[in-house]
């Protein structure tokens, strides 16, 4: 077995309402009551822990275009200080057919990028073209193009182009899994990745599929499992205790499959969480995901040769 062991004793943030780096009992109870569904009532549970908004010292640049399509845009969050920092790029979910990197007036998914900056990184949130109008490989082409844009401009943001980590959730996790399991999508970023964090995705697809299409043979080509066994990119997977049944099955399957293949990887079961709360918990003080994710980034940043200053 080659599962990564990461330290869980990092710094816990002091945010009102969440103490001891745990979900409040009432939030845990509400999540458990929802059950194994993707319930929109999850976001209001976490909104009170994100009322501070974006700290004034963080510089945010919205809607940087990496292509001509309106969906091909990303947001970048920086401290405006320092150089050579790791970069965390977040890929949102939405069933391949909906979703956005930023919802005006709401905390998601600025909370991810704010957390990244507050922990010594550059944070980025990227969009991509959506199905059914855009089928495979459109979204993966966009994720790769967004990463390439960040790589090409990394030094302008204070980042290191050799220390890029991509985190995907739900459909975004599937896109990241497809990306790292298909070398052509990694090559399109202009380099490699320092690591991939993959939260509650699907790694085996069946036709018909909203993104991969209706042709069974083509859908099979999109599947990520075999490529995940072979990639040299460090991998860290999570799923939630109260995840949807398909994500539970897929998360456990990929952990068991990679373990049986002797493929080193990280895997964490998010106790007390559901499909969305894993991401909503970031930058709240509840550190069940934030701590091991930061440890993963720190571990593999240290293993990467820093890019030259030029």
Language model features with spans:
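Short amphipathic alpha-helix adjacent to the substrate-entry channel of hydrolases
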Residues: 102-124
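The conserved beta1-alpha1 loop
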Residues: 91-93, 150, 239
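The feature captures the conserved acid-bearing segment of alpha/beta-hydrolase catalytic domains
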Residues: 189-195, 200-260
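C-terminal catalytic histidine-bearing segment of alpha/beta-hydrolase fold enzymes
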Residues: 238, 245-248, 252-255, 259-310
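Short beta-strand element of the alpha/beta-hydrolase
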Residues: 84-95
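Primarily recognizes the serine-hydrolase "nucleophile elbow" in alpha/beta-hydrolase
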Residues: 145-213, 219
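Serine-hydrolase catalytic-loop signature spanning alpha/beta hydrolases and amidase-signature enzymes
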Residues: 95-98, 103, 123, 149
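N-terminal cap/lid segment of alpha/beta-hydrolase-fold proteins
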Residues: 26-83
């Amino acid at each position: 077995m080659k599962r990564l062991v990461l330290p869980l004793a990092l710094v816990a943030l002091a945010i009102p309402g969440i103490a001891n780096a745990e979900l409040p009992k009432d939030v845990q109870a509400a999540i458990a009551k929802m059950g194994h569904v993707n319930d929109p009532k999850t976001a209001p549970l976490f909104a009170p822990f994100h009322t501070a908004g974006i700290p004034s010292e963080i510089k945010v640049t919205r809607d940087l275009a990496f292509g001509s399509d309106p969906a091909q845009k990303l947001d970048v969050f920086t401290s405006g200080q320092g150089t050579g920092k790791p970069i965390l790029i977040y890929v949102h979910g939405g069933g391949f057919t909906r979703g956005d990197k930023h919802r005006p007036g709401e905390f998601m998914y600025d909370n991810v990028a704010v957390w990244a900056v507050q922990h010594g990184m550059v944070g980025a949130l990227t969009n991509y073209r959506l199905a059914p109008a855009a089928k495979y490989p459109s979204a993966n082409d966009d994720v790769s193009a967004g990463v390439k844009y960040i790589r090409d401009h990394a030094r302008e943001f204070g980042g290191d182009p050799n220390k890029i980590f991509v985190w995907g959730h739900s459909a975004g996790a599937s896109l990241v899994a497809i990306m790292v399991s298909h070398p052509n999508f990694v090559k399109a970023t202009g380099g490699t990745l320092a690591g991939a964090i993959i939260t509650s995705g699907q790694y085996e697809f069946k036709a018909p599929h909203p993104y991969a299409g209706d042709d069974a043979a083509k859908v099979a080509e999109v599947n990520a499992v075999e490529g995940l066994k072979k990639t040299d990119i460090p991998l860290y997977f999570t799923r939630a205790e109260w995840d949807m049944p398909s994500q539970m099955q897929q998360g456990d399957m990929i952990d068991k499959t990679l373990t049986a293949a002797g493929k080193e990887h990280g895997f964490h079961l998010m106790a007390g969480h559901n499909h969305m709360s894993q991401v909503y918990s970031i930058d709240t003080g509840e550190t069940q995901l934030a701590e091991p994710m930061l440890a993963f980034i720190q571990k593999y940043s240290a293993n990467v040769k820093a890019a030259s200053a030029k």
